[in-house]
Amino acid sequence: MGPPSGKTYMGWWGHMGGPKQKGITSYAVSPYAQKPLQGIFHNAVFNSFRRFKSQFLYVLIPAGIYWYWWKNGNEYNEFLYSKAGREELERVNV
C-alpha cells in the first residue's frame, strides 16, 4: 500500500485499512493530568526570584540615573532661590 494519492481511498477515521492494533492491555492517566497544580507555590517563589534577578538591573540603573538627576536638580533649584544663589539666578535668566 503506497502513499495516499487522489485515487487511493484509505478509509474513514478509525478504519484506515492498516493492521489491527494488538497488545494494548492497560490505560493510564498521565501524572500531569492527575496533579495539575503540583508544586505551583514552590515554583512561583523560585521562578519569581529568578525573573527578578535577571531583570532588576534594567530597572535599577535607569531609576538610579533618574534619581541622581532629580536630586541634583532640586538641590540646584534650592540654591538658586536662596540668598547665596540670587546672583547666579540673575545670570542664568538673562
From Swiss-Prot:
Protein name (database record): Cytochrome b-c1 complex subunit 8, mitochondrial
Task: Recite the other comments.
Answer: Present with 6140 molecules/cell in log phase SD medium.
Q: Which organism is it from?
A: Saccharomyces cerevisiae (strain ATCC 204508 / S288c) (Baker's yeast)
Q: Where in the cell is it found?
A: Mitochondrion inner membrane
GO MF annotation list: ubiquinol-cytochrome-c reductase activity
| Topology feature Mitochondrial intermembrane, residues | 81-94
Q: What SUPFAM superfamilies does the database record attribute to this sequence?
A: Ubiquinone-binding protein QP-C of cytochrome bc1 complex (Ubiquinol-cytochrome c reductase) (SSF81508)
Query: PANTHER family per the record?
Result: CYTOCHROME B-C1 COMPLEX SUBUNIT 8 (PTHR12119:SF2), UBIQUINOL-CYTOCHROME C REDUCTASE COMPLEX UBIQUINONE-BINDING PROTEIN QP-C (PTHR12119)
